Amino acid sequence: MNNFILLEEQLIKKSQQKRRTSPSNFKVRFFVLTKASLAYFEDRHGKKRTLKGSIELSRIKCVEIVKSDISIPCHYKYPFQTLVYLQVVHDNYLLYVFAPDCESRQRWVLTLKEETRNNNSLVSKYHPNFWMDGRWRCCSQLEKPAVGCAPYDPSKNASKKPLPPTPEDNRRSFQEPEETLVIALYDYQTNDPQELALRCDEEYYLLDSSEIHWWRVQDKNGHEGYAPSSYLVEKSPNNLETYEWYNKSISRDKAEKLLLDTGKEGAFMVRDSRTPGTYTVSVFTKAIISENPCIKHYHIKETNDSPKRYYVAEKYVFDSIPLLIQYHQYNGGGLVTRLRYPVCSWRQKAPVTAGLRYGKWVIQPSELTFVQEIGSGQFGLVHLGYWLNKDKVAIKTIQEGAMSEEDFIEEAEVMMKLSHPKLVQLYGVCLEQAPICLVFEFMEHGCLSDYLRSQRGLFAAETLLGMCLDVCEGMAYLEKACVIHRDLAARNCLVGENQVIKVSDFGMTRFVLDDQYTSSTGTKFPVKWASPEVFSFSRYSSKSDVWSFGVLMWEVFSEGKIPYENRSNSEVVEDISTGFRLYKPRLASCHVYQIMNHCWKEKPEDRPPFSQLLSQLAEIAEAGL
């Protein structure tokens, strides 16, 4: 009777991190619930299932939904938790499990509650949010064993099935959903039967947006399919992304360069200001009496009444920003010149997609063409190549014995879901022949450290600050997704067109098998970028990434110099332990160097998060260093 299967399903589990040094990762597992235990198996296609863990139901102290306030970094978005008592070590540990949909999660939680509600060791309070970065997100307590902050009711919804809907409720549930229209910002060509081709500026019905990176849409002829969400934007008169003059997250320095390169009187753009939700109009003019043309910046102000209205010059107030821009395209109205030529950088080139096609992460060898070797890294050689002879890609061939391949393959699909304009996109893996290959977005100018050294003496301080901003944007995204880089440095960032910098190789050091690189005593271990808690205890967190980011900023503002110059690893450890920090680079302002020093606080909790660093750097950039 105890072996009777109550539920079985493929779910995703988060590593339990029973040791402080254990990595935080997500793995697909096949879960089986019986009257006696909750077991999970490794389930690979064509292979026998392997038991990876089993929990006696009698030891479960709590089963509950996790009310998350963060982006879930795996493709199952419905988390629940079990708190388990381990009699052997007299300790508690959490098992976070992610279901594919709300119904699946509800089914597992209700069944587990029913089977455990009479356990002797149930808790009276639990934590409704995640334990993350050394604290509970729900109540900010800093001890993992801390008593919960919300009452736990083991019987709530456990044994009672919901009442059937009334006829009125039933009719309501079958009402047609309100139609949402989206607009394509780019063309998207595809031959995949699961997908739908897009034409720039055409409208589509949004059918399903539950997947972050791929939306299901329908065209005006009734054809349906998936398309990359980064190519689409919701249709709304106040959605600025539909307008050719809007540049979402461009820095002041890059905006000025674009407008100066245009060189046309009245060339303009609207961009995000440093305060979230506010905007700036930047316009090029030759009208001011001076030898050189210049860029003027106007903050778009808001009225205090409701609904808000917008203006640049107080005499001319409008109900929306598009109406304000439309007026000033025909009238100066207090501006140095009227807005004549819209300038937009981000619509010139379509963004990368999360995967080369919808649902595709395994790439066939016949689909890849190798062109030339362009570098080498910790895992092996890197080649420029093409996918299906048309999409330029970077292909990393993995040297035998360099990587824990099985562990990486388990997480590759999850890593592909990480997609951001300032991250180098992993497109997929090629597994069917040795050596295995990783297929990445191709970045034109190679790694940042080499680029800085090759162009030394040619950079303005504003340009270097823009590079740091790019990296910080990517790291703020990883921080929000609860992903630790573990090896952030200029060598692991890549340079693309228009000097856009993207973070690469995030989390990859978890799969390195070379002890000389992964052990803090190894000759290849990157001590010069490591925080004190990393080289002393191998304790990684987003705050250890912040320390590394401070060193990366130093690399950038010293135009590619090696930190701590000729000091050995042991000397660096000794210096840092006695309070020594890197000197201020010549091109770094006092404000910039102050941020570096904030990153190098000895205690991790004293270092700012990337979200705060991003705001501080943006403020410095807007103020002109």
From Swiss-Prot:
The gene is Itk. Induction: Through a myriad of surface receptors including the TCR/CD3 signaling complex, coreceptors, or chemokine receptors. Its cofactor is Zn(2+). The modification Phosphoserine is found at residue 570. It comes from Mus musculus. Zn(2+) binds at residues 127, 138-139, 149. Its EC number is 2.7.10.2. Residues 177-237 form the SH3 domain. Tyrosine kinase that plays an essential role in regulation of the adaptive immune response. Regulates the development, function and differentiation of conventional T-cells and nonconventional NKT-cells. When antigen presenting cells (APC) activate T-cell receptor (TCR), a series of phosphorylation lead to the recruitment of ITK to the cell membrane, in the vicinity of the stimulated TCR receptor, where it is phosphorylated by LCK. Phosphorylation leads to ITK autophosphorylation and full activation. Residues 4-117 form the PH domain. Residues 368-620 form the Protein kinase domain. The lineage of its organism: Eukaryota, Metazoa, Chordata, Craniata, Vertebrata. It catalyses: L-tyrosyl-[protein] + ATP = O-phospho-L-tyrosyl-[protein] + ADP + H(+). One of its GO terms (biological process) is T cell receptor signaling pathway. It is an enzyme of class 2 (transferase). This is Tyrosine-protein kinase ITK/TSK. A zinc finger (Btk-type) spans 119-155.
